[in-house]
Swiss-Prot record:
Keywords: PQQ biosynthesis, Transport
Name of encoding gene: pqqB
Name used for this protein in its record: Coenzyme PQQ synthesis protein B
Recorded metabolic or biological pathway in which this protein acts: Cofactor biosynthesis; pyrroloquinoline quinone biosynthesis
GO terms classed as biological process: pyrroloquinoline quinone biosynthetic process
Lineage: Bacteria, Pseudomonadati, Pseudomonadota, Betaproteobacteria, Nitrosomonadales
Its job: May be involved in the transport of PQQ or its precursor to the periplasm.
InterPro entries to which the protein is assigned, alphabetical: Metallo-B-lactamas, PQQ_synth_PqqB, RibonucZ/Hydroxyglut_hydro
Native species: Methylobacillus flagellatus (strain ATCC 51484 / DSM 6875 / VKM B-1610 / KT)
Highest taxon listed in the record's lineage: Bacteria
Keyword Zinc tagged: no
Pfam families: Lactamase_B_2 (PF12706)
């Protein structure tokens, strides 16, 4: 299995266009050791030819241009992307769908009922695509017991589980969470049995998650915030990290403590907010992650399982 990180930042990217926090300001001025990052997305393949895209960020065109296998050039119109799996309906994970509207071949999109509802009502991106390329929508089972496959992506099997999280602001059920608003996915390579667990939006470790995470050779999970009060402390938001569906890295029950329980797996943080000190490669927080054997995803990162 080949996992390629197309984008590793949370919504807004890094640096964020209107942000002058120490990280964003320092990156622009060249005074901190850090890498630019686009908004989070990965693609996965078992054969290096047919790729499944997870989420479509607003930066998808740039991300495709920077990863040659997604444009193999076999015909006058071509793509290495054979299917799109949407983890949720958040704007930073779906806006890129509009950038993929060209062509006569329908987009093969895999999403839950809740995500489909959001993307045909509150933010009707799928309705808009029907006026261009069109969409073949495939349902995703979320009970963790029934797997699904993506046509034309041989050698891969996917098992999804519902995660507690908030629906997008434009969702018809914004303040009434439903199973399927957000999912985590166990990705299995049927050729060698290797597995990866992908959950860029993970608010808490629910009882059904350890059984899936224990199977994984690689765990890629929510790296949005370092502390629960990160945005509060900077005066940027009135809510805590967990209030908006993101388990912070530090503190009791934080992501570091969780990942310490899976020492045999490769552990990678993704979907990193621009305020998070782990973006600074020489920060004390990054040193602590390294000491624990936890990696920080970056654009262009390749994971081979």
């Amino acid at each position: 299995m080949h996992i390629h990180v197309l984008g590793s930042a949370a919504g807004g990217g890094f640096p964020q266009w209107n942000c002058n926090c120490p990280n964003c300001d320092g990156l622009r001025k060249g005074t901190i050791k850090a890498k630019k990052r686009t908004q989070s997305s990965i693609c996965v393949s078992a054969d290096g030819i047919n790729w499944v895209l997870f989420n479509t960020s607003p930066d998808i065109l740039q991300q495709i241009q920077e990863f040659a296998p997604l444009q193999p050039g076999r015909a006058i119109r071509d793509s290495g992307i054979v299917g799109i799996v949407l983890i949720d309906a958040q704007i930073d994970h779906t806006t890129g769908l509009l950038m993929l509207r060209e062509g006569q071949v329908k987009r093969e999109i895999y999403c839950t009922d809740m995500v489909y509802q959001d993307l045909t009502t509150g933010n009707p991106l799928l309705n808009i695509l029907d006026h261009y390329c069109g969409v073949n929508r495939h349902d995703i089972p979320i009970d963790g017991k029934h797997s699904f496959s993506v046509e034309h992506a041989p050698g891969l099997r996917f098992t999804a589980v519902a995660l507690k999280s908030a629906a997008p602001p434009y969702s018809p059920h914004r303040h009434d969470p439903h199973p399927g608003d957000t999912i985590g996915v166990l990705i299995e390579d049927l050729n060698n049995g290797k597995k990866a667990f992908y959950a860029p939006g993970l608010g808490e470790i629910e009882p059904h998650l350890p059984a899936l995470m224990e199977q994984a050779d690689c765990i890629m999970v929510d790296g949005t915030f370092w502390t629960d009060t990160e945005m509060l402390d900077m005066g940027l938001m009135s809510k805590k990290a967990r209030d908006i569906g993101h388990n912070p890295q530090s503190g009791p029950g934080g992501m570091m403590e969780v990942l310490d329980g899976y020492p045999g797996a490769r552990r990678v943080l993704i979907h990193i907010n621009n305020t998070n000190p782990i973006l600074r490669e020489d920060s004390a927080e990054r040193v602590e992650l390294t000491r624990r054997g936890i990696e920080v995803a970056y654009d262009g990162m390749d994971i081979i399982l």
